């Protein structure tokens, strides 16, 4: 008799994706982040669902409803802080996952990579809209500043902004629609995750060596299921340490002040995971130029496969490219720091230099390094 997991139409899909899936025998912990991201998404949908049961998307009651969740709802504080810090963990895992893809040349699986970029945009949009919902000062002004950037689009800009706002300023209509989108987008992301996996399973996973692993595959279960469970437990441990001991460590104190359109906070800044892009936006004195640079800072990932000049897939045996990769990581950390600083000397100059370096590494230096390394191999 055939095993039910191999015969049943639904069980067969799960079996071929999570149990009998042939996986490379040498994938490292850097390959854990996919499952960690799935765990984060599940956690965010679950905690978000319970928050939505008590939240009201009205400008007069939104702030109070969040306070009510924290004070009066059973374990409401826990659900709220798990959701807020879960987003931070989500982005840490996201950036690690993308970084792994860049380092080991996983972007050569172009369909998987491109769906991943769409996923990244979806989750960034979700996080941005989620930050607006508590209706604190930073929520309101963050929404105002970021949506206002669309007014830089020639001809249709102003109409577009007012259409998104649902009026002439960020108000009740904006909050209501942001809540609606914030609720629906994670489900869109879940569907995209399925497509992401579909494309990945067409080709199979990459591995640290960058060479084909078809001659040496092992079943996903039990080897990688147990490895993923370990990773998930560590993720939950770090998240719960954050939630229990310093839930507001990564937040902004200004968001505990109710939104006031008449009082601008001294430093308007997004959540920490958007600071690098915000720094790139601010480093260009022109509004439209800044918006384009902001978009390109993420969209540049689309052309990474086209800029691959090396004969080797990953960077495991390419020291020059390795140096450039870690320089890029340092540069992104610098941009993140700059994004949180006021717009004054010397931060403006540092931000501009870091922004130029970011694009130079990806567009110029890495392709050149690939060519140099190809030539070194001939000697």
UniProtKB/Swiss-Prot annotation:
SUPFAM superfamilies: a domain/subunit of cytochrome bc1 complex (Ubiquinol-cytochrome c reductase), Transmembrane di-heme cytochromes
Annotated TM spans: 33-53, 77-98, 113-133, 178-198, 226-246, 288-308, 320-340, 347-367
Binding site for heme b b562: 83, 182
Compartment(s): Mitochondrion inner membrane
Binding, heme b b566: 97, 196
Keyword vocabulary terms for this entry: Electron transport, Heme, Iron, Membrane, Metal-binding, Mitochondrion, Mitochondrion inner membrane, Respiratory chain, Transmembrane, Transmembrane helix, Transport, Ubiquinone
The organism's place on the tree of life at top rank: Eukaryota
GO process annotations (BP): mitochondrial electron transport, ubiquinol to cytochrome c
Xref: InterPro entries: Cyt_b/b6_C, Cyt_b/b6_C_sf, Cyt_b/b6_N, Cytb/b6-like_sf, Cytochrome_b, Cytochrome_b_C_euk/bac, Cytochrome_b_N_euk/bac, Di-haem_cyt_TM
Residues given in the record as a ubiquinone binding sites: 201
Keyword Electron transport in annotation: yes
Family: Belongs to the cytochrome b family.
UniProt miscellaneous comment: Heme 1 (or BL or b562) is low-potential and absorbs at about 562 nm, and heme 2 (or BH or b566) is high-potential and absorbs at about 566 nm.
Entry protein name: Cytochrome b
Protein source organism: Eumetopias jubatus
């Amino acid at each position: 008799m055939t095993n039910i997991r191999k015969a049943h139409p639904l069980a067969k899909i799960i079996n071929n994706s999570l149990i009998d899936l042939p996986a490379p025998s040498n994938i490292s912990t850097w390959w854990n982040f996919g499952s960690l991201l799935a765990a984060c998404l599940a956690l965010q949908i679950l905690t978000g669902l319970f928050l939505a049961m008590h939240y009201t998307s009205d400008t007069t009651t939104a702030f109070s409803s969040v306070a009510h969740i924290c004070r009066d709802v059973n374990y409401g504080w826990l659900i709220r802080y798990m959701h807020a810090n879960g987003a931070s963990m989500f982005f840490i895992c996201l950036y690690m996952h993308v970084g792994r893809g860049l380092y080991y040349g996983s972007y050569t699986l172009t369909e998987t990579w491109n769906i991943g970029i769409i996923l990244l945009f979806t989750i960034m949009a979700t996080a941005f809209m989620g930050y607006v919902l508590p209706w604190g000062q930073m929520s309101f002004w963050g929404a105002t500043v970021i949506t206002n950037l669309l007014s830089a689009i020639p001809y249709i800009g102003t109409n577009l902004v007012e259409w998104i706002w649902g009026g002439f300023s960020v108000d009740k209509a904006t909050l209501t629609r942001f809540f609606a989108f914030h609720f629906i987008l994670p489900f869109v992301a879940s569907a995209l995750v399925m497509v992401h996996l579909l494309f990945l399973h067409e080709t199979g996973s990459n591995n640290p060596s960058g060479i084909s692993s078809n001659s040496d595959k092992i079943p996903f279960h039990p080897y990688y299921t147990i490895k993923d469970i370990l990773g998930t437990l560590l993720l939950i441990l770090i998240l719960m340490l954050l939630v229990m001991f310093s839930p507001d460590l990564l937040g902004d104190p200004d968001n505990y002040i109710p939104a006031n359109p008449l009082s601008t906070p001294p430093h308007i800044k997004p959540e920490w995971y958007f600071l690098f892009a915000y720094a790139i936006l601010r480093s260009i004195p022109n509004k439209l130029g800044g918006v384009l640079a902001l978009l390109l800072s993420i969209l540049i990932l689309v052309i990474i496969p086209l800029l691959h000049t090396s004969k080797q897939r990953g960077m495991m045996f390419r020291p020059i490219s390795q140096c450039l990769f870690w320089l890029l990581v340092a540069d992104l950390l610098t941009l993140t720091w700059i994004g949180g600083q006021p717009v004054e000397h010397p931060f403006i100059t540092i931000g501009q230099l870091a922004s130029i370096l970011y694009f130079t590494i990806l567009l110029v230096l890495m392709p050149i390094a690939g060519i140099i390394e190809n030539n070194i191999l001939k000697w």
